[in-house]
Amino acid sequence: MRNAAVKAGAKFIVSPGLNPKVVKYCIEKGVPVTPGTANPSDVEQAIELGLEVVKFFPAEAAGGLNMIKSMAAPYTNMKFMPTGGINAKNINSYLAFPKILACGGSWMVKADLIKNGEFEKICNLTKEAKELAKSIRP
């Protein structure tokens, strides 16, 4: 299972949790991997595996930006990519924190938009998100 995405041609892997077997496999294959973390123990494990960037998930439910700032303080070399509860109203505050490389947000690509074939709306929401990000990080 851990090699299915790579065999299908995935150029990078982002996961909701930290599975050491998946991380090690990706490192062996030279595939960038960003596993999900939600607490300092997860970050410790990521560091042990040689990672410098982790996903923080579910961001808002796990304490949001305040939790990321708390975790970033002792782990000065770690960068974060929060997802889960990120939206057009809060993305700027996340992106303003320098330890955050990027944010993910499903508000841009909702399942019902895909189901209904509303791809123009998806493009517009994605462009909106890009402009929001550019306003913080030109």
Regions picked out by a protein language model, each given a short descriptive name:
Residues 26-31, 112-138:
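C-terminal helical cap(s) of enzyme catalytic domains, especially alpha/beta-barrels
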Residues 76-77, 91-92, 123:
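C-terminal output/effector regions of signal-responsive regulators
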Residues 1-8, 41-49, 66, 73, ...:
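Catalytic cores of alpha/beta
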Residues 2-3, 9-18, 32-43, 52-60:
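Catalytic beta/alpha-barrel core
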Residues 7-13, 27-34, 48-53, 74-78, ...:
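Glycine-enriched alpha-helix->loop->beta-strand junction motifs that scaffold or abut catalytic
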Residues 22, 26, 42, 68:
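Aromatic/hydrophobic pocket-lining residues that form π-stacking "cages" and hydrophobic walls in ligand
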Residues 16-22, 55-65, 99-121:
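Glycine-rich phosphate-binding active-site loops on the catalytic face of alpha/beta enzymes
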Residues 73-77, 96-99, 127, 131-138:
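Generic secondary-structure signature for well-ordered alpha-helical cores
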